[in-house]
């Protein structure tokens, strides 16, 4: 298995798909990295030479990926919460941020339903 940016890339996949195992790299960016490194994106990871892997590592190193990207994302959310702006408050309450309705739906963001309180007679 090839190791790029601290992630093991599966051997059986094409280079374009294998690079998407790295957090922060999707199909488009993966393709751009392969072109910049001069590696055919249809080539399997197990068929890559050490020189190809080194070029890919160098190209991936130009982007913010994995732990740094996760840290940056959480810091951005924390900043919004500290500011107390609308988006920060919605993050804090665990509700949708972008104007979606919450009277019905929004179950993914709100979590499972709580049991309704039974009425005492």
From Swiss-Prot:
Belongs to the universal ribosomal protein uS13 family. This is Small ribosomal subunit protein uS13. Part of the 30S ribosomal subunit. Forms a loose heterodimer with protein S19. Forms two bridges to the 50S subunit in the 70S ribosome. Keywords: Ribonucleoprotein, Ribosomal protein, RNA-binding, rRNA-binding, tRNA-binding. It comes from the Bacteria. InterPro entries: Rbsml_uS13_C, Ribosomal_uS13, Ribosomal_uS13-like_H2TH, Ribosomal_uS13_bac-type, Ribosomal_uS13_CS. GO terms for biological process: translation. Residues 94-121 are annotated as: Disordered. GO terms for molecular function: rRNA binding; structural constituent of ribosome; tRNA binding. Disulfide bonds: none annotated. HAMAP family: Ribosomal_uS13 (MF_01315). Gene3D superfamilies: 1.10.8.50, 30s ribosomal protein s13, domain 2. Located at the top of the head of the 30S subunit, it contacts several helices of the 16S rRNA. In the 70S ribosome it contacts the 23S rRNA (bridge B1a) and protein L5 of the 50S subunit (bridge B1b), connecting the 2 subunits; these bridges are implicated in subunit movement. Contacts the tRNAs in the A and P-sites. The gene is rpsM. GO terms for cellular component: cytosol; small ribosomal subunit.
